[in-house]
């Protein structure tokens, strides 16, 4: 039996956050997933974070210098929890005992529109 696709009116509405990440060590997309999830869990707990529907859609490695590595990413979350996700991302400051800065540089309803905030 084939499952039916949900019509657009019944789907959950997503928003896409463009993130700017500066860290003193090298990170991968998997590391960023752990950083984001751990930051949200510390601030809102597992029950609250489970509702966010977080997903790292794209990950860009921009620049490596002696002082820091510069990355940008697109993060998906549910529309109702955008403010909570932004608040928990602002509180992230350490990863593996290295300084890290995560800031939101843009918010959009589609991935294509969110990519205009990303420097390539």
UniProtKB/Swiss-Prot annotation:
Pfam families: RNase_P_Rpp14. It catalyses: Endonucleolytic cleavage of RNA, removing 5'-extranucleotides from tRNA precursor. InterPro entries: Pop5/Rpp14/Rnp2-like, Rnp2-like_sf, Rnp2_archaea. Its EC number is 3.1.26.5. One of its GO terms (molecular function) is ribonuclease P activity. It is found in: Cytoplasm. Gene3D superfamilies: Ribonuclease P, Pop5 subunit. Disulfide bonds: none annotated. GO terms for cellular component: cytoplasm; ribonuclease P complex. The keyword Methyltransferase does not apply. One of its GO terms (biological process) is tRNA 5'-leader removal. Keywords: Cytoplasm, Endonuclease, Hydrolase, Nuclease, tRNA processing. Belongs to the eukaryotic/archaeal RNase P protein component 2 family. Part of ribonuclease P, a protein complex that generates mature tRNA molecules by cleaving their 5'-ends. HAMAP family: RNase_P_2. Consists of a catalytic RNA component and at least 4-5 protein subunits. This is Ribonuclease P protein component 2. It comes from Methanobrevibacter smithii (strain ATCC 35061 / DSM 861 / OCM 144 / PS). The gene is rnp2.
């Amino acid at each position: 039996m084939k499952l039916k696709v949900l019509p657009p009116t019944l789907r959950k509405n997503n928003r896409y956050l463009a993130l700017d990440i500066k860290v003193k060590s090298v990170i991968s997309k998997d590391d960023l997933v752990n950083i984001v999830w751990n930051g949200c869990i510390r601030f809102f707990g597992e029950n609250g974070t489970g509702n966010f529907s977080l997903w790292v859609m794209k990950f860009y490695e921009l620049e490596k210098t002696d002082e820091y590595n510069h990355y940008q990413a697109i993060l998906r979350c549910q529309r109702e929890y955008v403010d909570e996700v932004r608040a928990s991302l602002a509180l992230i400051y350490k990863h593996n005992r290295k300084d890290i800065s995560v800031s939101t540089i843009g918010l959009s309803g589609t991935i294509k529109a969110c990519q205009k905030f990303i420097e390539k």
